[in-house]
Amino acid sequence: LNWGAILKHIIK
């Protein structure tokens, strides 16, 4: 999974 994009989506 692309955690960089996921975390950026969760932590705005």
Swiss-Prot record:
Location (main, coarse): membrane
UniProt effect for mutating residue 6 to L: Increased hemolytic activity
Consequence when changing residue 6 to A: Complete loss or severe reduction of antimicrobial activity and loss of hemolytic activity
GO cellular component, one term: extracellular region
Consequence of changing residue 3 to K: Virtually complete loss of antimicrobial and hemolytic activity
Subcellular location: Target cell membrane; Secreted
Alphabetic keyword roster: Amidation, Antibiotic, Antimicrobial, Cytolysis, Fungicide, Hemolysis, Membrane, Secreted, Target cell membrane, Target membrane
Superkingdom of this protein's organism: Eukaryota
Modified residues (Lysine amide): 12
Swiss-Prot/TrEMBL GO biological process terms: cytolysis in another organism; defense response to fungus; defense response to Gram-negative bacterium; defense response to Gram-positive bacterium; disruption of plasma membrane integrity in another organism; killing of cells of another organism
Known function: Antimicrobial peptide active against Gram-positive bacteria M.luteus (MIC=1.5 uM), B.subtilis (MIC=1.3 uM) and S.aureus (MIC=10.6 uM), against Gram-negative bacteria E.coli (MIC=3.7 uM) and P.aeruginosa (MIC=51.7 uM) as well as against yeast C.albicans (MIC=7.3 uM). Has weak hemolytic activity against human erythrocytes. Probably acts by disrupting membranes of target cells.
Protein's recorded name: Panurgin 1
